[in-house]
């Protein structure tokens, strides 16, 4: 099991007594997954994985490490899912919409801006997989990932159409209506894989392999011109509108008030109360 420094203590405790070895990523002498596979596997081996859970860029590093050794991939099934019978379902938290008052730019304006970028690149299709990119582009927010206002989804765009892949139950009727008015079709979350197989064989496709999973990229036709470029949403998302800058200032005022109250409480109670990091965090 490979994990970073955040989980060294937890991993060691929870794996104690098992047959699983903890690999502390970044530590001296600890191989990367790619290095480990290259060292341990025999020529001609098959490497099994769930292509929906690893990025294409990650598998690119694996491919490079085993080059010339006649190895192949098997990624059609999630074997863990077959034995994890009580596995929790994917999150289905309701999505809400941000008004232009907060975003400073309408969904229609954002879609037009991204389509202009696609036109400059000569792209026929844009595949979006980064949840923050999709949330920003559509002015929608969710609660599917703890402490991140995003929702589980994929999205594709052409010059005159857009498809949002998600569980429709997380959208209310009003949001569905406004998305339809902006030319956005809704489809089931996992339909993207079969839809990508139907893409024109000569299409120019933009997809960020650093965020797109392996199966997304490899569902596209082999003959398609797949350009592994940074999502054209990333830079526009980073440029804050006037409304966003003003709202950031308001948020900083609220944050400053909370910190000021906390510092007052701390000075007043140091030496009087038994204050730990945990109790201080709860107070804050």
Predicted regions and their residues:
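A composition/biophysics-driven feature that prefers long, compositionally simple stretches
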Residues: 1-284
